[in-house]
Amino acid sequence: MEHICGTSRIAGFRFSLYPMTDDFISVIKSALKKTDTSKVWTKTDHISTVLRGSIDHVFDAAKAIYLHAANSEQHIVMNGTFSIGCPGDTQGDTYLSKGDKRVNEDAVRGLKAEAPCQFALYPMNEPDYMGLIMEAVDIAKAQGTFVQGVHYASELDGDAHDVFSTLEAVFRMAEQQTNHITMTVNLSANSPSRKNRKQG
């Protein structure tokens, strides 16, 4: 496969889903099965799942998987990395659909889930990386999802639709200004400790 040295606009998301239940296999399989992945290339192995395609379709599928898993009402965590423009990437193992219709949006629009999140943006080989990170924080503040800076990350909170909208806006802003972007995300839903804190 041909190496394309940072010029690829193939976006990717490699993630692992962790349902905190003995029935974790069915929660994972159900979330993946309910999500329409016809617009992305996807593969699941014994460690993680990867989605590859356009930014539109990668974020569409990622949000749908999270929402379906969270609506199991089990405590779930999604941990993953979005990336675009990796110098070591190839043109293989992808599906860049010509259509921009988000194939999961109608199905998940009515699904609700909390999405407390910690994310970190890494503009690779970018001298003004802190400038881009501060732009990311400003986007989150403007969208009403920013909570605070924490060690090695920024914390977001809100409905999953809003949080994923912020993450996508940050990713798009950064990829328009530098070639290679990675962004790590850690999201949680239905955490017992969070419920106890709210009740207390």
UniProtKB/Swiss-Prot annotation:
Record's keyword terms, sorted: Transport
Purpose: Part of the ABC transporter complex YkoCDEF that could transport hydroxymethylpyrimidine (HMP) and/or thiamine. Could also transport other HMP-containing products. Binds thiamine via its HMP moiety.
Protein name: Putative HMP/thiamine-binding protein YkoF
Molecular functions (GO terms): thiamine binding
Signal sequence range: none
Species, as recorded: Bacillus subtilis (strain 168)
InterPro entries for this protein: HMP/thiamine-bd, MTH1187/YkoF-like, Thiamin/HMP-bd_put_YkoF
Residues that bind thiamine: 17, 49
UniProt subunit comment: Homodimer in vitro. In vivo, may be a part of an ABC transporter complex which is composed of two ATP-binding proteins (YkoD), two transmembrane proteins (YkoC and YkoE) and a solute-binding protein (YkoF).
